Amino acid sequence: SDLASHSWSGDVVSTWEVMRKQLAAGLNYSLCGIPYWNTDLGGFFAWKYNNNVNNIAYHELHVRWYQWGVFQPIMRSHNSSPVAVEIYQFGQKGDWAYDALEKYTHLRYRLLPYLYSTSWEVTSKAGSFIRPLMMDFPKDPKVLDMDTEYMFGHNFLVRPVTDSLYTWQDKNQNGYLKDLKKIGNTEVYLPKGANWTDFWTGQTLEGGQTIQREVPIDIMPIYVRAGSILPWGPAVQYSTEKKWDNLTIRIYPGADAEFTLYEDEFDNYNYEKGAYTTILMKWDDKERTLTINERKGNYKGMLKNRKFNIILVEPGKGCGDKEDRK
């Protein structure tokens, strides 16, 4: 049942090749009608790294796998002893692995309104989080068997980095760091039929082309479909720390868009009895207007007052994980 089941890819080995195969597995699960799926972030068995969490080559693999985890339905690190993957195992503030993990942890929390609303679509309309590109771009022959990137919901194009760029290992599996200032690239295909805004920079590119995206260790290629409405939540340490009474709404222009913001009591099954609300938002690209419709429904403790901060995304404005400014 898409209402109750959650599957994961099993206790997989920590290697780049295995990580790449998990991506294809997740796409296949989605096509089989199983929307809630994840993989053990960083892999489960770190045999190829001498089971040593201090192995610098393992740090790179774990960071890249963790970045991808932000755009999985369930984000879950799970590893075999003696490897522990708490963030403090990867250094401290100022260390490249620690900082990258912290950055993407915060990003996951900021995306909660988007995630929760997408989960409602999964429940109410038999939707899916992970969407092979053929689902949204069936007329583009280049995406029919593409297993390196996917749509997350209807708005995000996600291209995980699945190659080692900044570390290497000797014959004894010891890890060594390369020069992090020598930035590597990852190939990204932008599907034909839409334009795409770089989540990190705000630059918009035309679809139907392959690009080389620079990928510093703290950047995974993420693009937002032009004509998207993205609710952006508060910075929190746990999911219910702050109410959603002051959300930012990022508008990615270039086409008409709509998004339904879903809310409920967050911690029970009362939504099955109708205890939830929805707010439909529509963007008219020609008129450059955003319409926020009246809230429908009700539930105990729902907000009586709220503020939406509207941001029209452009280079340097409404980009990445930074605080939005009007």
Residue ranges of predicted features:
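Solvent-exposed, conformationally flexible loop/turn segments
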Residues: 208, 325-326
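Accessory, solvent-exposed terminal regions and/or long lumenal/extracellular loops of proteins
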Residues: 219-325
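Catalytic-domain carbohydrate-binding cleft regions of carbohydrate-active enzymes
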Residues: 1-219, 224-225
